[in-house]
């Protein structure tokens, strides 16, 4: 048995807790199914899957201490006391998780239950498989040189505002701990998405909402205006706090159609997570200008596969993106895998956990990069038709090839 990679219940991203609190307040009776996806089809050995099963079971042993609750509440005063009381008593329920594997070493995982109960499984549902894979299946790598590599990344980002977003796909806990420890003294470092590490190092927990909040509103309020409904519900809970909107759940054009003058003024900015960052930035600036809003009063957080080195493509290069938009709109960068799973000769897993059904109705993610689409194919066609007017008869595969 390998060591449990989770350090505590709060060894997770802030957005899971902010969404859990919002779900408890707005939608406490909603049922959900989540599914784990292995985008590159990397096989997992029987031994690795057994280790994953064992550590999923051991998650039930975790609890939040009084000291952690007090520190968390102080760092994030937008949480109400009733949510902190809920979190203090929260325990993971491994019965909500189903793991299967076929003879070809195809590993699958699904999670079912109440939305508020299952929502915290997403992050350990990613880093537990990753930890097992790199301890058992892919062992051809070394920690040697990682500190020096991170220091070089920090130098490259010297003029950028950035945060660590590395929890979900980290190689192990040590890799993320090292990243925050080394990068926290960089002048542009603003915090980490990981609450446990934010409290440990006295930096700001970073995060607001993610795709699952908007995906669920496809069922709770309808597909066409799920973005608007999700943002309005979010503001009902947080009253202007945590004001970074996520535009690409069903495509950014659909989002901006819903991002009216009130919401555009209320939210501090948006997060780019798919499609060309330069095209998205131009679209965002034009949107604000059309509403008489100064784009320089808003921010775009870029977070799509960024790499902190000069060899990165223009679409993945934070420094090039920063320079391109300098003086036109504020920029910040959320960097994940490049901080916590960049090991020469040992590629990072490309894995994700997303909702599959809400109240037994399919939901999908169909963003600006079709390769990131998730969900039932027929449901994808429906969302694509409603949000973009594309015929239901158009094959999904042909669109992914750019046709």
Regions found by a protein language model. Name each.
Residues 1-226, 230, 235, 354-403:
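Ordered alpha/beta subdomains of enzyme catalytic regions
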Residues 2-3, 201, 206-403:
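Glycine-rich phosphate/ribose-binding loops and adjacent secondary-structure elements
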């Amino acid at each position: 048995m390998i060591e449990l990679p989770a350090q505590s219940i709060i060894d997770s991203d802030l957005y899971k807790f902010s969404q859990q609190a919002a779900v408890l307040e707005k939608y406490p009776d909603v049922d959900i199914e989540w599914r784990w996806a292995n985008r590159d089809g990397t096989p997992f050995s029987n031994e690795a899957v057994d280790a994953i099963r064992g550590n999923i079971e051991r998650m039930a042993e975790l609890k939040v201490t009084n000291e952690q609750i007090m520190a968390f509440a102080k760092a994030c005063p937008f949480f109400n006391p009733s949510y902190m009381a809920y979190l203090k008593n929260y325990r993971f329920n491994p019965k909500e998780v189903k793991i299967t594997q076929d003879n070809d070493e195809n590993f699958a995982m699904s999670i079912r239950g109440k939305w508020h109960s299952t929502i915290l499984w997403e992050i350990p549902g990613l880093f537990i498989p990753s930890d097992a894979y790199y301890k058992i299946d892919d062992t051809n790598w070394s920690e040697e040189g990682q500190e020096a590599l991170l220091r070089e990344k920090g130098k490259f980002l010297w003029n950028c505002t950035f945060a660590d977003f590395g929890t979900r796909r980290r190689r192990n806990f040590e890799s993320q701990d090292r990243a925050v420890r080394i990068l926290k003294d960089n002048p542009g470092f603003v915090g980490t998405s990981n609450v446990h590490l934010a409290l440990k190092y006295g930096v700001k927990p970073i995060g607001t909402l993610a795709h699952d909040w908007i995906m669920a509103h496809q069922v709770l309020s309808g597909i066409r205006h799920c973005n608007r409904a999700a943002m309005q519900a979010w503001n009902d809970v947080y009253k202007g706090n945590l004001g970074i909107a996520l535009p690409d759940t069903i495509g950014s054009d659909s989002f901006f159609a819903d991002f009216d003058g009130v919401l555009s003024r209320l939210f501090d900015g948006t997060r780019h997570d798919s499609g060309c960052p330069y095209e998205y930035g131009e679209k965002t600036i034009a949107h604000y200008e059309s509403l008489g809003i100064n784009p320089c009063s808003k921010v775009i957080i870029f977070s799509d596969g960024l790499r902190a080195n000069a060899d990165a493509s223009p679409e993945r290069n934070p420094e090039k993106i920063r320079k391109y938009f300098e003086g036109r709109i504020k920029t910040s960068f959320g960097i994940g895998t490049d901080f916590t799973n960049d090991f020469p000769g040992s590629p990072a897993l490309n894995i994700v956990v997303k909702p599959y059904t809400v109240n037994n109705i399919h939901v999908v993610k169909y963003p600006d990069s079709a390769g990131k689409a998730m969900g039932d194919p027929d449901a994808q066609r429906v969302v694509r038709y409603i949000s973009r007017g594309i015929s239901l008869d158009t094959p999904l595969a042909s669109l992914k090839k750019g046709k």
